[in-house]
């Protein structure tokens, strides 16, 4: 009876709603993008304001409940959802307010990339972000934010101007270069360790609304040639162009000849943010150097580009992934990739090679808390995906074996915290390196000394704060 009275009193304190097991909407609210995640919070607080978030934190702390925070539910490890604790659900806070005159956007902590892109593109503007539209802005930003605009404008965190944060003791703070600069530094890469961000303010850039896409596809037997071609191409692309290498099964899309449907192979995707003429000049040498099995070139809206990979990573798919960073895509690393890629156990599984550099490399190593080195030239993501949950175990073995072999050629022991399916303390420490981790731990001790926010890629508070 006490729990029922507590819940009803808590509900009365919220402008949003509080759900418990059995309530209408509870199961939908606890669902995650990764279908492997199946957890049951004792309470789900669907917060409509920073005051709601503060009330939820106080309610949980008074009752000794573990706290997790949901932005978009897209984290592979499912850290947004806790068992038997209180989940702060920010999805009602999904506003996007754009000021085209100042090129700024204020974005709720529960907004998705699709909502952000749609609002900013109405003004021909964009924030560098990820490549799956149903990803949450919050989690993506706090871990870094890698996407198509990275070489043009950097990471998502490189474009964060300020953040409205509710801390573990219920304070509502604005973090920026001028206010709580230590907290602002930590939020730009340190994940959800320091508080609940209810609103982000981003710097916007002119993008689109039309961009230019080029796709080339080759079979698995040409993997070595494709990866070497991509390596050379990445180094010579013009400033307003980006590219990615992906190893996937060809989709049954209209632009794919039927005989190649579901065929495993390699895609080289080139996106031009400049003129059509410049894009044509970039593509011509590719087909001459290594004629593809098929190709596809088209202008397309930027928002469509941002949704291009949604179908390959649908909501509810079972996922396990690992990532690493490479200074060089050496011949030895290429040999590892071409050896392991044909061994994948699910047709949905994939490997992605991102191009770093450009604006990303122009940011100082210590300007943000982002874990990756700014000298890194390549990011490799090995993603096990399956629509059959029982077959994920085999995909997990493939991912781990692939990662272990490729890790011998990595920049260091680090990886991208947003792509950690296994949240382990040594991996988190390695992602940031000793100096950044120690600095983050001191800031953690200042703003969350009791480690209230630990259901994440956790940074433990230092014994002594700043």
Question: Which sequence ranges carry the predicted segments?
Answer:
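Soluble FAD-dependent oxygen oxidases
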Residues: 1-466
């Amino acid at each position: 009876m006490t729990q029922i009275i507590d819940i009803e009193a808590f509900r009365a304190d919220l402008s949003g709603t509080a759900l418990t097991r059995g309530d209408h909407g509870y199961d939908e609210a606890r669902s995650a993008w990764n279908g492997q995640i199946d957890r049951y919070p004792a309470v789900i607080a669907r917060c409509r304001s920073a005051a709601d978030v503060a009330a939820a934190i106080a309610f949980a702390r008074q009752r000794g409940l573990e706290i997790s925070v949901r932005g978009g539910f897209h984290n592979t490890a499912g850290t947004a959802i806790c068992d038997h604790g209180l989940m702060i659900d920010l999805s009602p806070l999904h506003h996007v307010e754009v000021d085209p005159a100042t090129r700024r956007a204020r974005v709720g902590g529960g907004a998705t990339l699709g909502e952000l892109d749609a609002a900013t593109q109405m003004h021909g503007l964009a924030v560098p972000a990820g490549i799956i539209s149903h990803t949450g802005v919050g989690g993506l930003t706090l871990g870094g934010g890698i996407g198509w605009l990275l070489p043009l404008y950097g990471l998502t965190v490189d474009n964060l101007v300020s953040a409205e944060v509710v801390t573990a003791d219920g304070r509502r703070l604005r973090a920026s270069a001028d206010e709580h600069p230590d907290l602002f530094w930590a939020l730009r890469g340190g994940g959800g360790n320091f508080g609940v961000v209810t609103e982000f303010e981003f710097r916007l850039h002119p993008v689109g609304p039309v961009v230019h896409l080029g796709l080339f596809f080759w079979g698995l037997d040409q993997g070595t040639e494709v990866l070497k071609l991509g390596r050379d191409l990445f180094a010579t692309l013009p400033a307003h162009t980006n590219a990615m290498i992906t190893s996937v099964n060809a989709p049954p899309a209209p632009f794919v000849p039927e005989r190649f449907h579901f065929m495993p192979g390699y895609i080289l995707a080139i996106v031009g943010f400049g003129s059509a003429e410049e894009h044509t000049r970039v593509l011509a040498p590719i087909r001459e150097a290594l004629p593809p099995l098929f190709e596809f070139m088209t202008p397309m809206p930027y928002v469509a580009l941002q949704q291009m990979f949604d179908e390959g990573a649908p909501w509810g798919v079972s996922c396990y992934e690992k990532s690493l960073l490479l200074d060089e895509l050496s011949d030895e690393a290429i040999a590892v990739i071409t050896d392991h890629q044909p061994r994948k156990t699910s047709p949905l599984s994939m490997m992605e090679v991102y191009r770093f550099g450009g604006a990303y490399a122009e940011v100082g190593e210590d300007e943000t808390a982002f874990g990756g080195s700014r000298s890194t030239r390549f990011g490799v993501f090995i993603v096990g995906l399956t629509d059959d949950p029982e077959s994920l175990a085999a995909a997990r073995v493939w991912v781990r074996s692939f990662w272990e072999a490729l890790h011998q050629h990595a920049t260091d022991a680090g990886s991208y915290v947003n792509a950690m399916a296994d949240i382990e303390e040594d991996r988190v420490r390695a992602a940031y390196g000793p100096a950044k981790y120690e600095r983050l731990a001191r800031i953690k001790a200042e703003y969350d000394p009791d480690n209230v926010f630990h259901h994440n890629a956790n940074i433990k508070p230092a014994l002594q704060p700043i």
